[in-house]
Amino acid sequence: MFYEVRFHGRGGQGAVMAAQALAVAASHDGSSAIAFPFFGAERRGAPVLAFARFGQERLRVRTQVYEPHFVVVLDESLIETVDVLAGLRPGGTVVVNTMGSPDRLVLSKKAKSATVD
């Protein structure tokens, strides 16, 4: 089994670096891991996606993450403009970078949620 994580951020916020750091940390723990970005020619501040996939089995899948176990949102305002929970697996978790509590998040569907500042 492997885990899939999708990062939502804005250009320059570190979504790509966060995905890469997660993959490196997982590989140091003995897991197979891969991370990659998805963005076009947008400028700094435009929405970007990054993905990480890791697990004990050999990774053969090198596609975008469509059904993540975890979603990390680096800019809370993206929740209003992007369907950040699209494809989130049942029982999945969303982590949002905000000073607010998980109770005040307005999410498009039921999901486990956590906040971190």
Write out the residue ranges for each language-model feature.
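Active-site cofactor/cluster-binding pocket
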Residues: 1-117
